[in-house]
């Protein structure tokens, strides 16, 4: 299985001609953690994924993986680094003329010299991981959209990637199947300890799936950090998007103009209370992810730097044993049950 790697993005900017997509994007994805990238339509989230894997070249900035800057490295080194990535595209991106087995096996046949017997063992393992055992001979046109996404996910995992990218995995799925897919993503992170980055519009996914959340808005990264930071934030953009409200700076186009905001204020738009934070999805088997302990140490190390509401949310998630370990007091109800970190 792959083991996650830290991904450090520094000052990344991308344009198409004179049209700027985003500027000076800087954040770090800790190894093995689940990260979600949100933002209104048209903010360049999918473009960011393509820059991350080297399909598009940014005008400025750096992307560091294993001390290699993907923006400036030589083509042969970039080719090797790309093998560290697995990608689930919006529609699964399966070859319609191939059955699911051959779709999943494709990267192994293209990028390795493994024997067919080895390939079969690996493919069957990955298909079992995503719940597709018995469907190997089916064609993409014979299965549901959710199954196609799972087949695409199996293909993305087949080279044991250190970094797994998900481009709107919930696109086209109903809420129930989105919930099943989110549980699968958590379970796969537990099994692989790979670093996950998920681009999505789904608010429930953003509230329950990630360890860290980032929001792109108005050609910049508005905020990136632990889930507790964003889910308790009163920043107008972050709060509006994560709670799916009409009231706020985000309009039908990316940003409301001054007249719209003034009219909203004159109409007495009230300040909304943040809803209670939803619990993070836990592995189905009741165990923990390897990233949980690392994340807990990391977040507790920065606790004093976070706003009070985020601090309180983190403290409230700790068990009694964890409180004693970190010397924490002043939290809410103490728990010895499932952990969020």
Residue ranges and their predicted role:
Residues 164-167:
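Catalytic Walker B motif of ABC-type/P-loop ATPase nucleotide-binding domains
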Residues 53:
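Helix-to-loop junction immediately C-terminal to a conserved catalytic motif
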Residues 68-69, 116-134:
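Conserved ABC ATPase "signature" region
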Residues 139-143, 147:
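Conserved ABC ATPase signature
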Residues 158-162:
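A short, proline-enriched helix->beta-strand linker immediately N-terminal to the Walker B motif
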